Regions:
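Active-site-adjacent "subsite" loops/lids of carbohydrate-active enzymes
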Residues: 55-56, 142-143, 168-223, 252-265, ...
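Aromatic- and acidic-residue-enriched segments that line the glycan-binding/catalytic groove
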Residues: 100-120, 175-197, 234-303, 387-405
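Aromatic-lined carbohydrate-binding/catalytic grooves of carbohydrate-active enzymes
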Residues: 85-146
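Substrate-binding cleft of secreted/luminal carbohydrate-active enzymes
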Residues: 371-385, 428-441, 445-507
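C-terminal segment of N-terminal export signals and the immediately downstream linker at the start
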Residues: 3, 24-55
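N-terminal secretory signal peptides and thylakoid transit peptides that target proteins
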Residues: 1-18
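Catalytic domains of carbohydrate-active enzymes, especially glycoside hydrolases
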Residues: 74-97, 121, 226-228, 484-488
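Aromatic-lined carbohydrate-recognition surfaces of secreted/lumenal glycan-active proteins
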Residues: 168-176, 232-236, 275-282, 321-356, ...
Length: 515
């Protein structure tokens, strides 16, 4: 099946999305195609009306190598019989270099195979694509060498359809140095930090990178129109302030100060020079905190003084996050122009549940304006040590005057959590109430306009001394999600990490809930 769409309407539609969401950065051609406000609202409402969402949604994320290691039919048998899975988020584009290896820190569960020791995966596309979708970008050669000759879409999707399952392309775009080095031209689209150094993260304002991202969406929905039932897009990136605080999702550099970002800043009336000066001052403060060199007025007071004297710090942080919103809305518009009935949604990084700074700028309500569903990473077992580490980072930067134990009561109050002490959540994880809280928050913030799919923690990797998943944990988290009003769940993080007893607990629980 081949899908054709009107290019003029496509450009017009991107203008509709841009104007409705109040996002900047589109070209003058797109801006000129904007329609009256009443038409824009009706058009966006139509997207949601036309989108076909599966009832009793149970999804799972599956890496490309799984299909080769376990066999496609056997893996699908396991997913259906044990997990009650009806939708697979199959990685079609991935960055992750790691596999479970013999003698490694993460044990192989009771299925699958060990990966080769000492060999990092390169990442890239695990499907074949027509170059015509990438005519407007220099990033054309990105087929992964990891599983040569294996096209996950043509190999897996037909077998899933025969079982009445849905195949969702999982387009995962995290920053990864090996991909930056292996994909021709990727270094040219990299972010530039405040000191003028290129990093390992692509810039959302670089037109080549944006055309690359858009080309993949066109390829999934046009070239593979009969195979792909929906798309989930993800990129676990943060703006400069959250990156400076640090933690598990931090990327290299205080960014971005490339030519495209500085030009965009000037159109907003932001002084590039003062923004740089402010971030350099903030960097010096956090470096002093790392050395326990407390200024006479204290770390928090000097932090406030720095952002008051250099409000461009906050303006630049918003510029980065607005650009992130802008790209995602553009991808949504592309998808809806081609296949309005197919769901297009986003993976939401778990930091939105930890960081008040990240949650303030990448909130559920804003992302819901340009999506059909949100998959929220609310992994409660892994969330314990992750939250504990984040509070440690706060007390190593902005709140370096305090200890984590000092900050914990205030932090819990601000974030609305009722959890155990940091020491106890590190070893015992977070309770199912955390899943309930985040599910309800997402539903409330989005006004029920989009489907909410909480990610259920099933053996998300943990370190020695941290909480490990049990079947009872899975049952409790699954029940918490649905009792809070979730439209479905995504068994997380990866199928190849899950022990079958825990996967079965999810299947048993959803069968009971669905009746």
């Amino acid at each position: 099946m081949r899908v054709e769409f009107d290019r003029r309407k496509f450009v017009q539609l991107l203008g509709v999305i841009s104007a409705e969401f109040g996002l900047s950065g589109k070209t003058t051609t797109i801006a000129a195609a904007q329609e009256p406000t009443h038409y824009r609202s009706a058009e966006i409402s139509r997207f949601r009306t036309e989108t076909i969402n599966r009832k009793n949604f149970v999804g799972i994320q599956v890496k490309p190598f799984v299909w080769m290691d376990e066999g496609i039919d056997k893996a699908l048998d396991t997913l259906q019989e044990k997990g009650n899975v009806n939708t697979v988020f199959a990685y079609t584009y991935d960055y992750d270099p790691n596999r479970t290896t013999q003698g490694g820190p993460i044990p192989l569960p009771d299925h699958g195979k060990y990966g080769p020791a000492g060999k990092l995966r390169t990442g890239g596309a695990f499907f074949d694509y027509d170059q015509k979708y990438f005519r407007n970008t220099s990033l054309k050669d990105f087929r992964s060498p990891d599983e040569p000759g294996f096209n996950v879409i043509t190999a897996v999707a037909p077998k899933m359809k025969a079982r009445k399952m849905d195949f969702f392309a999982w387009d995962y775009n995290n920053a990864f140095p090996v991909m930056m080095q292996s994909i021709p031209g990727f270094t040219e689209v990299a972010e530039v930090d405040v000191y003028g150094r290129r990093t390992t993260s692509a810039c959302f304002n670089h037109p080549d990178y944006r055309a690359h991202l858009t080309g993949k969406i066109e390829s999934y929905l046009s070239q593979y129109a009969s195979e792909v039932d929906g798309i989930m897009w993800g990129c676990e990136r943060m703006g400069p302030i959250d990156n400076m605080i640090g933690g598990g999702w931090a990327t290299t550099g205080i960014c971005c100060f490339c030519d495209f970002c500085t030009a965009k800043a000037r159109t907003r009336g932001i002084s590039v020079e003062r923004a740089k000066l402010g971030y350099i001052q903030l960097d010096k403060l956090f470096q002093a905190a790392a050395k326990h060199e407390r200024p006479s007025d204290g770390f928090f007071v000097v932090f406030l003084r720095t952002i008051f004297e250099h409000p461009e710090i906050l303006s630049w942080n918003m510029l980065w996050n607005d650009s992130y919103h802008d790209v995602r809305s553009e991808l949504y518009g592309t998808a809806k122009a081609i296949a309005p009935k197919k769901p297009f949604g986003f993976h939401i990084v778990q930091n939105i549940t930890f960081s008040p700074f990240y949650s303030a700028v990448d909130n559920y309500a804003k992302v819901a304006e340009y999506s059909d569903f949100l998959k929220i990473a609310c992994y409660n077992n892994a969330g314990g040590p992750r939250m504990s580490h984040f509070v440690d980072r706060l007390c190593s930067t902005i709140f370096a005057d305090a200890t984590p134990e000092d900050l914990q009561p205030f932090y819990y109050k601000v974030m609305g959590y009722e959890q155990a002490s940091l020491k106890n959540i590190f070893t015992g994880g977070l309770t199912p109430q955390y899943v309930t809280h985040e599910t309800k928050r997402a539903i409330t913030d989005t006004g029920g306009a989009v489907q909410i799919y909480p990610g259920i923690d099933i053996d998300v990797p943990s370190s020695k001394g941290e909480k490990h998943t049990t079947p009872d944990d899975v049952r409790a988290a699954t029940e918490a999600a649905f009792s809070a009003g979730a439209n479905g769940i995504v068994l997380s993080r990866e199928y190849h990490e899950m022990w079958l007893a825990n996967l079965s607990a999810a299947g048993e629980t959803t069968r009971k809930i669905f009746g």
